[in-house]
Amino acid sequence: GRMALFYLNPEKDYEFEIIPVNYMGYEAKKVLEPAPKSKFYSVEPSDFHGINPKLNVKISDNILAGDILFYDKSDELLKFASPVSGQITEIIRGEKRKILSIKILADENQVFKNSGCLKTSANKDDIIEFLLSVGCWPFIMQRPYAIIANYKSSPKSIFVSGYSSEPLSADLDFTLKDNRKEIQAAVSILNKLTEGKVNVSIEKSSDSIFREINDIELYNVSGPHPSGNVGSLINKVDPVNKGESVWTVSAQDLVIIGNMILTGEFKAERIVSLSGSSIESPKYLKATIGCQIDSITNNNIHNLNNNNRIESKGLVQRFID
C-alpha cells in the first residue's frame, strides 16, 4: 500500500533514493454524484501556454455555455469557449494589463450555444475548422513542449492514455464507462488528422471502454506509475525525434469533443476524484471546468487546519511541485 517516489541526489550521480508515501485507504469510492453548483466560474488564459489572449467579451455581457471568451492575438482562429452560461462579472488583470482571469456568475439553469453537429463525412479541413470555431481545439496538445497543437501541421501519430496509474487519480475505467458514443465520435475524427494511428493505452487487466472502440491501436500496459502516463506510451510506441511532433488528448477531453461533434453543445464537464486523508467521504463528482474548488470540497473536510493542502492535481504531481 505504498508508492515510491524517486529523485536524483546531486551528490551521487544517477543513484536514486526512495521516499515511501502511504496513500492506501484514501481512494475515492466508486460512487458518482453531481458536484454542487458553483456560483462563480473562472477561466484563466495562463492555463494555455504561449497564448496571448484578446478578449471577445466585456464586463456585464450575458453569455451562453460555448460562447467564445477570448482568442489568441497571434492567431485569431484559436478560440477559447466559456464552460458555463451566465454574466461576465470581472476581468482580472495583472502587470501591463495582462489578462489573468475571466470570472463568470453562472446561470442557475445552464443554457448552451448550439454550433451544429459535425457530419461524419467531414474531411480533415472541415474537422479542423469545426474544432477551432467551437473552442475545442485547445484540448489537443502537441509534443514536444506540451503546447496547443499546431493545426497547420500534421502529427505523425496521436496518443491517448486510457489508464491513470497515478495514486488517488480518477479511475478512467469508471469515469468513461458511459461515454462510448462520445469517445468513438472523437476518435474517428482524430484519425482523419494524422497519417499515423490513434494510439491508446489501457491497464492490462481492466474492463476499459476503449476495448469497445474502433479506429484505435490499443496497448495493454501494467506496472507502477508512470506506466499510465501518455509520455510513457509515446516513448515505447513512437518516440518523438528531432523535427517530429505527436499530438495528445486526455481521455476525458475526448468526451467533451465527442459530445460537441454529436450534439453541437460545449459541455465542459469532467469526472473528478475527491480523495485524500482529510476527506470525510471520498467519492467521484461530475464537475464543470472552472468551478470554485470550495464548491467541491464544501462540508467534506474533517480536521480542517493549516496542515491541510487542497490540490487540483495528482499525488505525484503535488510532490514534484
Model-predicted regions and their roles:
Residues G1-N56, Y71, L105, L218-V221:
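N-terminal, Lys/Arg-enriched amphipathic/low-complexity engagement segments
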Residues I51, S82, K98:
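Exposed loop/turn and edge beta-strand positions of beta-sandwich/beta-sheet ligand-binding modules
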Residues I51, V57, S74-L77, S281:
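Short, solvent-exposed loop/turn positions at domain surfaces
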Residues V57-Y71, E90:
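Short, well-structured beta-strand-loop connectors
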Residues L77-S85:
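Short coil-to-beta-strand transition motifs
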Residues L78, I92-D321:
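Buried, small/hydrophobic-residue-enriched core segments of structured protein domains
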